[in-house]
């Protein structure tokens, strides 16, 4: 059986991809618009969650 491990991004990496500040990323996480997990106290965001967030934003823009 093959297990696919999702690529996880740090908050600064998400900031760079979305071109937003740290507080905006945490706001998106807090409001559950951006999925995330904690690993030993460190916040990580799956790349799929960032992609899904961007797709949702594009859908709202149309």
From Swiss-Prot:
Gene Ontology MF term list: DNA binding
Signal peptide segment: none
Pfam families according to UniProt: HTH_17
Keywords: DNA recombination, DNA-binding, Plasmid, Viral genome excision
InterPro entries the record matches: HTH_17, SinI_DNA-bd
GO biological process: DNA recombination; provirus excision
Protein name: Excisionase
Source organism (scientific name): Streptomyces ambofaciens
Gene (name only): xis
């Amino acid at each position: 059986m093959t297990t696919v491990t999702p690529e996880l991004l740090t908050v600064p990496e998400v900031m760079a991809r979305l071109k937003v500040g740290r507080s905006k990323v945490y706001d998106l996480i807090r409001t559950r618009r951006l999925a995330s997990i904690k690993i030993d106290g460190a916040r990580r965001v799956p790349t799929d969650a960032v992609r899904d967030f961007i797709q949702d934003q594009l859908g709202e823009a149309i």
